[in-house]
Design a protein with these regions (language model features):
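Reductase modules of NAD(P)H-dependent flavoproteins
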Residues: 1-117
């Protein structure tokens, strides 16, 4: 289906059983270096360490995108504040950090704004 839309999909497996042998972030780095013109937007979800690496790559390369967060959301409506994540204004690096509720403002955020800890 992706090919019908002109989108290339690539597969990465840690053990090399299919597609790229290695972490998906090493494949992402390869694509950013070899085909920067194709890197128009990045959508990320997965384990936090992987998302942090992908986020850094996207931000360093100036690739816009979105990041989908999972978190403990006891109330699910933003009252308990258990799911807050720090955010920054990428256009004003000296500006203060603020916190957003994943269950209320997310779970999808601008890839440049969320601080993954």
């Amino acid at each position: 289906k992706f090919r019908d839309l002109g989108v290339s999909a690539r597969l990465a497996t840690d053990d090399g059983s299919r597609g790229h042998h290695g972490f998906v972030t090493s494949l992402l780095e390869e694509i950013i270096q070899q085909e920067p013109e194709r890197c128009t937007c990045l959508y990320v979800c997965g384990p936090t360490p992987m998302m942090r690496v992908a986020q850094n790559m996207a931000n360093n390369a100036g690739i816009p995108g979105q990041i989908s967060l999972e978190g403990i959301m006891p109330c699910g409506i933003g009252v308990c504040m258990a799911c807050v994540v720090p955010c920054v204004n990428p256009d004003e690096p000296e500006a203060a950090t603020w916190y957003e509720r994943v269950c209320y403002a997310g779970p999808v955020f601008d890839i440049r704004e969320v601080v993954l800890i």
